[in-house]
Each structure stands twice: as structure tokens, then as C-alpha cells.
Amino acid sequence: MTDLTTSAIERVLRNNYLGHLAYLWQGKPHVIPITYYFDPADNTIISYTSEGHKIDAMRKNNSVTVQVEEIQSMFNWESAMVHGTFEELEGDIAKQKLHSFIEGVKSIIRRKERREVEFINEFSSKLYSRGIPIVYQVKILEIAGKRRET
């Protein structure tokens, strides 16, 4: 295994929209899949959720990790890890960031998967049945990455 350069880590983050979010809840680490968008201009990860233990946990302890991988095979993969702080967004900035999230993910899908998507539910499983979506970002403090190639 070798370390990824900063530009390679950013490429992994830019070229994907599915990752894993790690946070602490009641003293235990939790890791869940998320749909995200990497905003290189703000150096943030943008996502959204609904009320529940994940958002409660991040409100209490804003230290989180996001992990993203590109796996070709067991012997050929890249993994990027982001350590940062959770920040809940509100009002116009939340609307702006959610728009960036939607358009950014749609662009990645068009480029990588060569298909058109029109609605958020085509690429994100979060339902609005539990109220208004909570838009958040992870301010990136530290990044790391690994690669394995044979």
C-alpha cells in the first residue's frame, strides 16, 4: 500500500458521491453510508439528513470522519479519509448548499455512469417522511488516503 497525494485524495472525493460517515453516539462509534458532494471551493463535504440519532449525535459531538473508496478489485483500490467538524446549515445557505449537492451529484452521475437523473430520490435514499431535510457540511480539517495496486 502507498499513501495518496493530496491531489489524488481530492480526485477520489470529487469523482464520487457515496461514502461512509463515522460519528460517536452514546460512547460508541457508528459508521453509515451517505450520499455526499465534495465542494472544493469551500473544502467541505455537503450532505443532508432527517431528525434522528445521527443528527443528535453530531450536534453533541461535531467531530466526524467521512471515508470514500474506489474499488476495482481486492488488489486495486483507493481510499480517501476526511476528518472534520459537522456544521448544521440553515436558511438561504442551507438552500444554496442543498442545490450545490443536487447539481454536483447529478454531474458526477452523468460523467461516471453516463445516465441522466432528474430528481434527488434517484440517487439518494433519504425520505422526507420525518420532516424538513437537515442540510449539513463537514468542514475538512485533515485528509489522508491509501492506494493498493498490483
Locations of regions flagged by a protein language model:
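Short, basic/aromatic recognition patches
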Residues: 1-20
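Structural motif corresponding to alpha-helix initiation and N-cap regions
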Residues: 6, 51-52
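Short beta-strand segments
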Residues: 16-50, 66-67
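Short, structured patches in soluble enzyme cores that scaffold and shape functional sites
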Residues: 25, 68-70, 139-142
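Beta-strand-connecting loop/turn residues
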Residues: 41-43, 62, 141
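Helix-adjacent hinge/juxtasegments
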Residues: 54-89
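Charged, gly/pro-rich active-site loop segments
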Residues: 78-150
